[in-house]
């Protein structure tokens, strides 16, 4: 599941954790929140790589 995630800086990791926690505070399950943020990170990395 996480093999294709790009390496993240500490700041990027912290931002991802905060986004996951926000989704969970809104009632989303941990697994779903992680999935959404992981997909977002992959999409952002793919967009940056294709430039």
UniProtKB/Swiss-Prot annotation:
Q: Which family does it belong to?
A: Belongs to the UPF0181 family.
Q: What is this protein called?
A: UPF0181 protein VV2_0310
Q: Which organism is it from?
A: Vibrio vulnificus (strain CMCP6)
Q: What HAMAP family does the annotation carry?
A: UPF0181 (MF_00507)
User: Which NCBIfam families does this chain map to?
Assistant: PRK05114.1
């Amino acid at each position: 599941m996480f093999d294709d995630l790009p390496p993240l800086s500490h700041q990027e990791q912290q931002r991802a954790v905060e986004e996951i926690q926000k989704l969970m505070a809104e009632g989303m399950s941990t697994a779903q929140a992680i999935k959404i943020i992981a997909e977002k990170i992959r999409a952002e990395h793919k967009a940056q790589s294709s430039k």
